[in-house]
């Protein structure tokens, strides 16, 4: 049974009903409808913390989805789950793939920066200042990309860039 039919939350049910109506009204291909259904079910599972089910739905959504913009959000959400699971290498891969398809996704750049910054901090704790500097430089580049797209956001990142003298 599609997840949209088992949600107990009134808002989720209402959103699912509206989405189903829109899918019937708006001219879309069967592949687009299938991809959206999997994506919607993935978001529902993810919001409930059912990451394995969410991943399964997102992976299924990538098969029929050909639109690069829509696909970027699927890949971004896969990256979010891998981040939550502590699988940072996989997360970076999916954020990167999302940005390849949609370079105007500042949240993906921000999340990549956060992971790089975290790895830089780990390297500092391990006493490897050269690796730490490399990771921190990479974090700075990703944060600059995110800030360029949404200048009013990521204030903490902007402050970090200024403090570390990486802001141009």
From Swiss-Prot:
UniProt keyword terms in alphabetical order: Chloroplast, Membrane, Photosynthesis, Plastid, Repeat, Thylakoid, TPR repeat
Membrane topology (UniProt): Peripheral membrane protein
Superkingdom of source: Eukaryota
GO BP annotations listed: photosystem I assembly
Localization annotation: Plastid, Chloroplast thylakoid membrane
Main location: plastid
Family annotation (SUPFAM superfamilies): TPR-like
Signal peptide region: none
HAMAP family: Ycf3 (MF_00439)
Family stated for the protein in its record: Belongs to the Ycf3 family.
Protein name: Photosystem I assembly protein Ycf3
Organism, scientific name: Amborella trichopoda
């Amino acid at each position: 049974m599609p997840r949209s039919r088992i949600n107990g939350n009134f808002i989720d049910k209402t959103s699912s009903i509206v989405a189903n109506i829109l899918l019937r009204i708006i001219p879309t291909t069967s592949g687009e409808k299938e991809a959206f259904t999997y994506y919607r079910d993935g978001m529902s599972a993810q919001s409930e913390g059912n990451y394995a089910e969410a991943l399964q739905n997102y992976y299924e959504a990538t098969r029929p989805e050909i639109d690069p913009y829509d696909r970027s959000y699927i890949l971004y959400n896969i990256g979010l789950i891998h981040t939550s699971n502590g699988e940072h290498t996989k997360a970076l891969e999916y954020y990167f793939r999302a940005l390849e398809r949609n370079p105007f996704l500042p949240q993906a750049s921000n999340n990549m920066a956060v992971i790089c910054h975290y790895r830089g901090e780990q390297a500092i704790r391990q006493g490897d200042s050269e690796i730490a500097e490399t990771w921190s430089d990479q974090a700075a580049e990703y944060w600059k990309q995110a800030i360029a797209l949404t200048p009013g956001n990521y204030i903490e990142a902007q402050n970090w860039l200024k403090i570390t003298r990486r802001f141009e």
